[in-house]
Swiss-Prot record:
<keyword id="KW-0520">NAD</keyword>
<dbReference type="GO" id="GO:0015990">
    <property type="term" value="P:electron transport coupled proton transport"/>
</dbReference>
<feature type="binding site">
    <location>
        <position position="102"/>
    </location>
    <ligand>
        <name>[4Fe-4S] cluster</name>
    </ligand>
</feature>
<feature type="binding site">
    <location>
        <position position="132"/>
    </location>
    <ligand>
        <name>[4Fe-4S] cluster</name>
    </ligand>
</feature>
<dbReference type="GO" id="GO:0045271">
    <property type="term" value="C:respiratory chain complex I"/>
</dbReference>
<feature type="binding site">
    <location>
        <position position="37"/>
    </location>
    <ligand>
        <name>[4Fe-4S] cluster</name>
    </ligand>
</feature>
<keyword id="KW-0479">Metal-binding</keyword>
<keyword id="KW-0004">4Fe-4S</keyword>
<dbReference type="GO" id="GO:0008137">
    <property type="term" value="F:NADH dehydrogenase (ubiquinone) activity"/>
</dbReference>
<keyword id="KW-0813">Transport</keyword>
<dbReference type="InterPro" id="IPR006138">
    <property type="entry name" value="NADH_UQ_OxRdtase_20Kd_su"/>
</dbReference>
<dbReference type="InterPro" id="IPR006137">
    <property type="entry name" value="NADH_UbQ_OxRdtase-like_20kDa"/>
</dbReference>
<comment type="similarity">
    <text>Belongs to the complex I 20 kDa subunit family.</text>
</comment>
<feature type="binding site">
    <location>
        <position position="38"/>
    </location>
    <ligand>
        <name>[4Fe-4S] cluster</name>
    </ligand>
</feature>
<dbReference type="GO" id="GO:0048038">
    <property type="term" value="F:quinone binding"/>
</dbReference>
<keyword id="KW-0472">Membrane</keyword>
<keyword id="KW-1003">Cell membrane</keyword>
């Protein structure tokens, strides 16, 4: 659970950061930014076979209700301002997961004049999931890595 110590009389000693980060890891609410074939694998992860709900990950329709953005697919120059706008609307603290070779670094279309060579050029990315397209298992592993990163966060308010 991440609680440092439990005393004999039922008292728990911990920090506010540990409790808040524990709650944040169990309630990630992603907004999807599916741009290409990686979005199909993201949908697979949310369906019955993998069921992201058991990790507390529930997809939200609005960025104002979400704290995680999953960028899945090829990001073009024309779509980059929209990506930034959605990122700015996310609730604080917010995280970004880049899914697939195209979102990570341009992928197959890296040398095209219209492709952004990585989502990290537009928004700060916390976790990269490699693959073309990555499997649903790889996405779940990336989400678990993000949960571990959130647990290690030492401040209540995250600096940009």
């Amino acid at each position: 659970m991440g609680i440092e110590g439990v005393l004999k009389k039922g008292f728990i000693t911990t920090s506010a950061d540990t409790v808040l980060n524990y709650m944040r890891t169990g309630s990630l609410w992603p907004v999807t930014f599916g741009l290409a074939c990686c979005a199909v694998e993201m949908m697979h992860a949310g369906m019955a076979r993998y069921d992201l709900d058991r990790f507390g990950i529930i997809f939200r329709p609005s960025p104002r209700q979400a704290d995680l953005m999953i960028v899945a697919g090829t990001l073009t120059n024309k779509m980059a301002p929209a990506l930034r706008r959605v990122y700015d609307q996310l609730a604080e603290p917010r995280w970004v997961l880049s899914m697939g070779s195209c979102a990570n670094g341009g992928g197959y279309y890296h040398y095209s004049y219209s492709v952004v060579r990585g989502a990290d050029r537009v928004v700060p990315v916390d976790v990269y999931v490699p693959g073309c397209p990555p499997t649903a298992e790889a996405l779940i592993y990336g989400l678990i890595q993000l949960q571990q990163k959130i647990k290690r966060t030492s401040t209540i308010a995250r600096d940009e």
